[in-house]
Amino acid sequence: DEQARLAGMLHDIGKYSVAFQSRLQGSSCTVDHSTAGAQEAFRLRQPEAAFAIAGHHSGLPDGGSSTDRSERPTLFGRLKKAVEPCETWSREVQPSLSSAKRPAQIAPDNLSEAFYTRMLYSCLVDADFLDTEAFMREEPAPRGGYAPLSDLFQKLRQHIAPWLNPSNALNRKRCEILQRCLDAGRERPAGLYTLTVPTGGGKTVSSLAFALAHAVAHNLSRVIYVIPYTSIIDQTADTFRSILGDENVLEHHSGADYSASDDAVDAALYRKSLATENWDAPVIVTTAVQFFESLYSNRPSRCRKLHNIANSVVIFDEAQTLPVHSLLPCVEAIGQLVQSYRVTAVLCTATQPALQPLFAQLAPRLSMQELCPDTSS
């Protein structure tokens, strides 16, 4: 995306100022180096990039209003702020505006523009963190290097192969649900789905089967499994680890601890700790709180992962437990991800909540379809 490229090129132009260069030589003066880039991006009529640049250290700011004074921390306030002269940046940095436009799939409404700004912000802050990490370390951090999703799909197929010749009625029903999910994953287009499976119907593995088959068929990047309670997350994560391998499954919630038990650095734990920062793992198991609060956060550390939610399959387990008081922003977020960011979302439960009217109202371009009709009994 050219707006992301523009944000990357302009975000640190304030460091060209004499004051900041003095700081590099040991001066203790404090220099605001992000406002200059935000002002330049806004001058170039790129407000989303201006928001991202302004907040890449301190947090995504409120927009405020054109009447805000220069001392206000809002974007409009900072656009009026006097900055240290730094014009020499233009000798080395020459951003191109020929294609720096909002992507066509982003609707021209406030919510869509806000989500696009957050995604742009996520790209910028994650790239900035990674670039700083690479500069400060003497060797590359142990990131990436995961098995491709196609390999994980084969691991799953090997795991379920003995199940496909069921010996009793219950197992035949489970097998039917599993096979339907595999077929749907390969054949269905990206979109919004429900998976209504009775208790004991093998919902966890069947939903994983759909997700991996779908991700491979549509060249998606990862599978994200969103669970409402930490009390049930460990069991799901253990199931996935037993099938796909511990190294390929990232469990991220308040109770997940990746600190080493002694002074020695555990390479596997450290790798997972790094992955919690930006969700670059192939399979992620997280909580609804972590997922939705990150989508609506303004802090760089929480927002780093957002761009890695794009181009994914997201399974919402026990969707009927989405809190009523937060239902509107949750549904709006799911709608944005599916409509604009190549996310396939599955609402997975034994008893579907009545979300169809909300999605029809908030995301009218989406149609909600059941993956396994006639399996409720």
Name the predicted role of every residue range.
Residues 1-159:
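Accessory nucleic-acid engagement/destabilization modules that flank
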Residues 188-194, 221-222, 280-281:
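Pre-Walker A (Motif I) flank of P-loop NTPase domains
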Residues 245-296:
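Inter-Walker segment of RecA-like/P-loop motor cores
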Residues 220-244, 253-256, 354:
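Conserved Walker A/P-loop ATP-binding site and its immediately adjacent core
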Residues 160-196:
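Conserved pre-motif I regulatory segment
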Residues 188-211:
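Walker A/P-loop
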Residues 351-377:
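Interdomain hinge/linker at the junction between the two RecA-like core domains of SF2 helicases
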Residues 284, 288-292, 300-340, 345:
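SF2 helicase catalytic motif II
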